[in-house]
């Protein structure tokens, strides 16, 4: 990974040795050996140019770093001089870059500085250039010609066997030639990579997976895009293999790459694992720093730094990439800002420890702002009215608030210190209504992180409430005295309240002072006071997160509404579980009223938070918020009653439907039984019908047979009668002529034949 020149340790600066040149490339080559005095060797130290120069600190020599090889293959010119002649590397002063066919390794001359004004350009000609030279000198006369010649001859550079080729382990920044188009290389397989199927080819016995497909599956949500992946590959010195046309066609058909894409690259599994680990490692992300840290590093926004979350801008998150000079400058500025932020953080931690030490000296009863914790930089009389109080703490037990600009070096006796001390809860948190950003909601955070910080703040407030509930068991009583506090003018409010911003013509300084007096007659013990510590939840803690001055940006309303929902639920639970029962509480609730408007308060209104001697804008705002909370509670109760009624109605409907369903199911069962009985009867009837049909057919056949027998008997009887009647006639006719007898016999025979037939 490249680093700025200013950060390279001197151990990596290898002193140049006298070059020993050997060449056997073509006819007409001259082998020149020159000493360090005759030819200027490539300088590796930082150049004396005007801007910051970035170059790679890899060692130049391959094994012993003892000899630098320069092969001159061009003709014509005096090699070895300071001018860029035909066979020497163009590093000298006065002249230009190497001429003709010089085959110079750009790694050897990465930081040359032409003393004559035009030198320093390294040209690569002759068709065997290894890569695009890094032009890091002030005079860049021949850099364009060298880059054009190197890009045109990139195919031959990868297979060049000259001694001046790229050094081992050095990435080649020109596009390598694609894979050879052979059937073995074009055989695609679907392999399993981290639980997903990825297309792969086997090239020269090495399994290579499709880089764009692996990017879509595993890296898309980790980096900005595929260009970032290629930047990482260059930095990791990984050269992906370029697909040939047939492989691209196959990958398009498989859906591994999008239709219309005509190029693709392959990468080995080992290199992909290296790339994946680099993408998932937060300290190695290249590129410019995030936007929120750019504003932090600027000097005019240095006061934002203490409010940023630690870890958002760590030293490793913005590494110098070695690509541009601006990146190096940004990295230096970032390091300075980080160091300053660490100092500020250390000061804050020390101040917090001092605060807790002084708090323990004056009594360990630190109950939710008993140290005159104020709301909106006014007096903390709410806690005096509502919370069991502790023994009075002197104004000397104060600290310097580290988060207020302009108040970092005040003496302990300064009145601002006591005021700032009164803004701190026992667990080290500031009250959410104070006129400065909350430490858990940094100004430089995006809105998504604000939600996270708010949830963390609610969690911390719950812990504080539990501690307060544990301490409330034995509260000592204290006589209250009137307190008048003013905000010091040299601590301007970074975030004024909403009412101050909305009111035309108003200024934040108009509400800087609020005098709040409490009557000396109110000397009752803390046990007789209104029990706002119901279930260990103080009103102060309940309203955490509702003040709009701690919400950055346009998200104020959303977050305030969100927290109001939560707080209304808390108040609802409190009112349901522990109602106000003491007579003192009822009396004080009925007695107090808004003197400015003459309006009596409703019975359940939290009036101990109101003071008739003059309400500041923030107190008015909080009064409005409490009214809104009461309305929200009433609405929630009404909605809950409505929901209960609807539930009851739905339950009754459900029971009715269930009874109706059971009745219908019984009827259905009876119908099914009846149907089964009828079907059985039908089967019996069918069987009886079939038997009767068979009997009928049998009787019909018998009848027909009987009729035929009767007919045959009747025909034989008629024949006998005819024979008896014809016999006398025949005898009478015999006496007649023979002809008549024969005729009669024939007629009789015919008659007999016909009767027998019938």
Curated annotation (Swiss-Prot):
Residues 20-53, 140-163, 506-524 have a biased composition (Low complexity). Residues 616-696 are annotated as: DACHbox-C. Widely expressed. Isoform 2 is found in brain, heart, kidney, liver, leukocytes and spleen. Isoform 3 is found in liver and heart. Isoform 4 is found in spleen. Residues 73-102 have a biased composition (Gly residues). It is found in: Nucleus. Residues 630-718 form a coiled coil. Keywords: Activator, Coiled coil, Developmental protein, DNA-binding, Nucleus, Phosphoprotein, Repressor, Transcription, Transcription regulation. Residues 555-564 have a biased composition (Basic and acidic residues). Residues 174-185, 292-301, 358-380, 387-399 have a biased composition (Polar residues). Pfam families: Ski_Sno_DHD. One of its GO terms (cellular component) is nucleoplasm. The keyword Transcription applies. Residues 1-105, 134-185, 280-302, 358-414, 474-532, 544-564 are annotated as: Disordered. Interacts with SIX1, SIX6 and EYA3. Interacts with NCOR1 and HDAC3 through its N-terminus. Interacts with SIN3A through its C-terminus. Interacts with SMAD3 and SMAD4. Transcription factor that is involved in regulation of organogenesis. Seems to be a regulator of SIX1, SIX6 and probably SIX5. Corepression of precursor cell proliferation in myoblasts by SIX1 is switched to coactivation through recruitment of EYA3 to the SIX1-DACH1 complex. Transcriptional activation also seems to involve association of CREBBP. Seems to act as a corepressor of SIX6 in regulating proliferation by directly repressing cyclin-dependent kinase inhibitors, including the p27Kip1 promoter. Inhibits TGF-beta signaling through interaction with SMAD4 and NCOR1. Belongs to the DACH/dachshund family. The DACHbox-N/DD1 domain forms a structure containing a DNA binding motif similar to that of the forkhead/winged helix domain. This is Dachshund homolog 1. The lineage of its organism: Eukaryota, Metazoa, Chordata, Craniata, Vertebrata. The gene is DACH1.
């Amino acid at each position: 990974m490249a680093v700025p020149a200013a950060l390279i340790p001197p151990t990596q600066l290898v002193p140049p040795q006298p070059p020993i040149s050997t060449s056997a490339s073509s006819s007409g080559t001259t082998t020149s050996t020159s000493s360090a005095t005759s030819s200027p060797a490539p300088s590796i130290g930082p150049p004396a140019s005007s801007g910051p120069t970035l170059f790679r600190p890899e060692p130049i020599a391959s094994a012993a770093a003892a000899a630098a090889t320069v092969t001159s293959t061009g003709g014509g010119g005096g090699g070895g001089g300071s001018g860029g002649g035909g066979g020497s590397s163009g590093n000298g002063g006065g002249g230009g870059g190497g001429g003709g066919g010089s085959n110079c390794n750009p790694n050897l001359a990465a930081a040359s500085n032409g003393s004559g004004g035009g030198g320093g350009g390294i040209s690569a000609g002759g068709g065997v250039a290894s890569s695009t030279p890094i032009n890091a000198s002030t005079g860049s006369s021949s850099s364009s010609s060298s880059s054009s010649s190197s890009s045109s001859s990139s195919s031959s550079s990868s297979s060049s066997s000259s001694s001046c080729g790229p050094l081992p382990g050095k990435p080649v920044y020109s596009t390598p030639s694609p894979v050879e188009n052979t059937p073995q290389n074009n055989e695609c397989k679907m392999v399993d990579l981290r639980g997903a199927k990825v297309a792969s080819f086997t090239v020269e016995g090495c399994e290579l997976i499709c880089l764009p497909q692996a990017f879509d599956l595993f890296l898309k949500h980790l980096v900005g895009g595929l260009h970032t992946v290629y930047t990482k590959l260059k930095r990791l010195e990984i050269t992906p293999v370029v697909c040939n046309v047939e492989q691209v066609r196959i990958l398009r058909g498989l859906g591994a790459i999008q239709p219309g894409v005509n190029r693709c690259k392959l990468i080995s599994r080992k290199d992909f694992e290296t790339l994946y680990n680099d993408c998932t490692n937060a300290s190695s992300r290249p590129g410019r720093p995030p936007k929120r840290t750019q504003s932090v590093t600027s000097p005019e926004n240095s006061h934002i730094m203490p409010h940023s979350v630690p870890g958002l801008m760590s030293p490793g998150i913005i590494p110098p990439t070695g690509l541009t000079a601006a990146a190096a400058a940004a990295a230096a500025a970032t390091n300075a800002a980080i160091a300053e932020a660490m100092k500020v953080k250390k000061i804050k931690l020390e101040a917090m420890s001092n605060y807790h030490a002084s708090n323990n000296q004056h009594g360990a009863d630190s109950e939710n702002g008993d140290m005159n914790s104020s709301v909106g930089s006014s007096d903390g009389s709410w806690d005096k009215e509502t919370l069991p109080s502790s023994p009075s703490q002197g104004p000397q037990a104060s600290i310097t608030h580290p988060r207020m600009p302009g108040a970092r070096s005040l003496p302990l006796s300064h009145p601002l210190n006591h005021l700032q001390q009164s803004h701190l809860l026992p667990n080290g948190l500031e009250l959410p209504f104070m006129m400065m950003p909350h430490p858990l909601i940094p100004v430089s955070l995006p809105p998504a992180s604000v939600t996270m910080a708010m949830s963390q703040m609610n969690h911390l407030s719950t812990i504080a409430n539990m501690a307060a509930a544990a301490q409330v068991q034995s509260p000592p009583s204290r006589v209250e005295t009137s307190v008048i506090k003013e905000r010091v003018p040299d601590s301007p409010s970074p975030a004024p309240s909403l009412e101050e911003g909305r009111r035309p013509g108003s200024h934040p300084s108009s509400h800087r002072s609020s005098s709040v007096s409490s009557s000396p007659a109110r000397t009752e013990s803390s046990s007789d006071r209104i029990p706002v510590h119901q279930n260990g939840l103080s009103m102060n803690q309940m309203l955490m997160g509702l003040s709009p001055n701690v919400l950055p940006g346009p998200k104020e309303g959303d977050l305030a509404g969100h927290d109001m929902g939560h707080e209304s639920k808390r108040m609802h639970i409190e009112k349901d579980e522990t109602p106000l029962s003491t007579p003192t509480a009822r009396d004080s609730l009925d007695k107090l009223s808004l003197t400015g408007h003459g309006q009596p308060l409703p019975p359940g209104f939290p009036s101990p938070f109101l003071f008739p001697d003059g309400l500041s804008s923030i107190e008015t705002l909080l009064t409005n918020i409490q009214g809104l909370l009461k309305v929200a509670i009433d609405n929630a109760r009404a909605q809950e009653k409505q929901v209960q009624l609807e539930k009851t109605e739905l339950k009754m409907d459900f029971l009715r439907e269930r009874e109706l369903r059971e009745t219908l199911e019984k009827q259905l069962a009876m119908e099914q039984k009846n149907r089964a009985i009828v079907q059985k009867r039908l089967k019996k009837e069918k069987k009886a019908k079939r038997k009767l049909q068979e009997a009928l057919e049998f009787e019909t056949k018998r009848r027909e047979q009987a009729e035929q027998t009767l007919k045959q008997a009747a025909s034989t009887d008629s024949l006998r009668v005819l024979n008896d009647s014809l016999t006398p006639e025949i005898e009478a006719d015999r006496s007649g002529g023979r002809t008549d007898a024969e005729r009669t016999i024939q007629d009789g025979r015919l008659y007999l034949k016909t009767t027998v037939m019938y």
